[in-house]
């Protein structure tokens, strides 16, 4: 069961995301349900650590098993979703991942994979293109250039 709560006042999610980079590009994804780019990842399950969750999500979405280098951010975000129009309070831990010992780069600059009944479209986006793309999280458009050396807590309100 995912750590996710819904009530009349909005939604709460506890999520993880994988930051995977190669030569000033970041791996982003989207699907037909979401018009914007986002990072691979998903909700943490009850009883699961954030580290276990990010590995599980990347395995499910990309069929690879990367290594975690380190956590980068805990981002507290408050927003209204562009797709469902609902209010969200979300905690997301972003992990920098090592993809060296995977076949991820051999998949090409754009590729699609299926996860169950869902098709995910992936693309290696150049850092400088992020500012012009419909991409979440917004803070990453600037902070991708200077990843924190220590775990950082941040808050984002839209």
Ranges and model annotations:
Residues 1-8, 81-85, 110-112:
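Short, P/G- and charge-enriched loop/turn segments at secondary-structure junctions
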Residues 1-19, 23:
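Acidic, metal-coordinating catalytic segment for phosphate/diphosphate chemistry
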Residues 8-12, 85-91, 114-119:
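A generic structural micro-feature
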Residues 22-60:
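Conserved Nudix-box catalytic region and its N-terminal flanking loop in Nudix hydrolases
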Residues 24-26, 34, 45, 74-79, ...:
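Short, charged/polar surface micro-motifs in flexible loops or helix N-caps
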Residues 35-37, 103-158:
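Nudix hydrolase/Nudix homology domain
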Residues 65-74:
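A short coil-to-beta-strand element that immediately follows conserved catalytic motifs
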Residues 79-107, 143:
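Active-site-adjacent beta-strand/loop module that shapes the phosphate/pyrophosphate-binding cleft
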């Amino acid at each position: 069961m995912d750590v996710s709560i819904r009530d009349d006042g909005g939604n709460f999610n506890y999520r993880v995301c994988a930051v995977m980079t190669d030569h000033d590009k970041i791996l982003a994804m989207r699907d037909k349900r979401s018009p914007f780019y986002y990072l691979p990842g998903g909700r943490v399950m009850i009883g699961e650590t954030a580290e276990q969750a990010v590995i599980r999500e990347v395995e499910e979405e990309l069929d690879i098993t990367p290594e975690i280098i380190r956590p980068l951010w805990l981002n507290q975000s408050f927003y209204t979703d562009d797709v469902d129009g609902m209010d969200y309070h979300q905690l997301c831990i972003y992990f920098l991942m090592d993809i060296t010992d995977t076949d991820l780069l051999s998949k090409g600059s754009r590729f699609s994979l299926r996860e169950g009944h869902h098709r995910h479209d992936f693309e290696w986006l150049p850092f400088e293109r992020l500012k012009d793309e419909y991409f979440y999280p917004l803070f990453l458009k600037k902070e991708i250039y200077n990843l924190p050396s220590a775990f950082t807590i941040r808050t984002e309100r839209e």
